[in-house]
Amino acid sequence: FMEKVSSPAISLLLALLCSFLPVNMTAVFGGLLLCAHAFALSLETFAVTVGILFIMYAVYFRVAPGQGYVLVLTPLAFFLKIPHVLPLVLGLTGGPVCAVPLACGTVCYYLMYYMKNNEKMLSSSETEKMAERLLYLVENVLNNRNMLLTILVFAVTLMIVYLIRRMSVDYSWYVAICAGAVSNVVLFLIGGLVMKASVSIGVVVLGTLVGVLVALIVEFFALSVDYSRTEYTQFEDDEYYYYVKAVPKMSIAVSEKKVKRINSRRRSTRRRR
């Protein structure tokens, strides 16, 4: 909405600057850009945006300051139409704290989505409708059923994947991915009916399948173990009994190379004789 901020030169400059700064600064610059575009629409849109971002960043920096990449990647995943990848992958590689930046990123996306789809109404200059637009904006952003359902389902799915993948069972990561995928689809279906939200089941199923594929790729690089060679052992000390399950990592057998040395001195002496 603000042409000066949307110029390629500004975008390139911010990209270069953020590449040298911590990921949390990238999230801060993203919030400032969002506020600038909101200011270009109207004063009340700017006020609501600043209020939402202030509360959101206060919660984020208090609870999960080290998960800035989640806050940055969440709106990007929504724009790429692959948001269902996030709860599955974060459940494997992160923990419950990732639900906070995931929810904050979801709020940012829906805020931008609403501003884009209601540009004409929000940019109206009629002063008598300013209070009406303000209430309408707050009502549609904070009480958006699709947004609330998405935050709730993603948080529950992330927790399911996280809890299962930490269990001491064989192939726990694969079980966690399958359970998370099923719960994601089922929760969106049930939640859409209960909350009367507009949910496209086909899009949810397709997005979940893409999430399963990405999660399997992450599992391949993050956890390569051979469950067929699992070993169990137990021992004790003065205070505790210990029961240990050892799962070896996958390894590629390297064939031993035999180097045969030929003594050239012996050959030369034989020739002289």
Stretches found by the model and what they are:
Residues 118-119, 166-170, 197-201, 217-236:
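Juxtamembrane/interface segments at transmembrane-helix termini
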